[in-house]
Amino acid sequence: MSSFLGKWKLSESHNFDAVMSKLGVSWATRQIGNTVTPTVTFTMDGDKMTMLTESTFKNLSCTFKFGEEFDEKTSDGRNVKSVVEKNSESKLTQTQVDPKNTTVIVREVDGDTMKTTVTVGDVTAIRNYKRLS
């Protein structure tokens, strides 16, 4: 998992507004979500990974073991059941389930770029991050 460890900054985002809309996120919150450029930091402590997301809008942190369900609060305030699977050393798949939607987030690292593909139903967004450290 060393390919994920460190700090990443959002560099480009495509179709994220449509994903937020599909999730029922309010117009005002979507406007904020479309303008912030979050930083995501991944750390490991034994068999637990922590993902810290920081932005001018909100800071969120979740700690998990691969393959084990955990409770997560999303940046738009939803409470979800989440599972992160380690597909390979450079690919993680996270599934978030709430009463209305299932969101699948695939994170893939290639060198100093992390491609994040977010899918809700038939709507997909791609958010690319650049490694800061």
Curated annotation (Swiss-Prot):
Record-listed (9Z)-octadecenoate binding positions: 107, 127-129
InterPro entries named among the record's database cross-references: Calycin, Fatty_acid-bd, ILBP, Lipocln_cytosolic_FA-bd_dom
Keyword Disulfide bond recorded: no
Gene Ontology molecular functions: lipid binding
Entry keyword Cytoplasm: yes
Location in or out of the cell: Cytoplasm
GO cellular component terms, semicolon-separated: cytoplasm
Tissues in which the protein is found: Tubercles, muscle layers and body.
Record keywords, A-Z: Cytoplasm, Lipid-binding, Transport
UniProt: (5Z,8Z,11Z,14Z)-eicosatetraenoate binding residues: 107, 127-129
Signal peptide: none
Record-linked Pfam families: Lipocalin
Top-level lineage group: Eukaryota
Similarity remark: Belongs to the calycin superfamily. Fatty-acid binding protein (FABP) family.
Function: May play a role in the transport of fatty acids. Binds various fatty acids, such as arachidonic, oleic, palmitic and linolenic acid (in vitro).
Annotated domain remarks: Forms a beta-barrel structure that accommodates hydrophobic ligands in its interior.
Descriptive protein name: 14 kDa fatty acid-binding protein
Species assigned in the record: Schistosoma mansoni
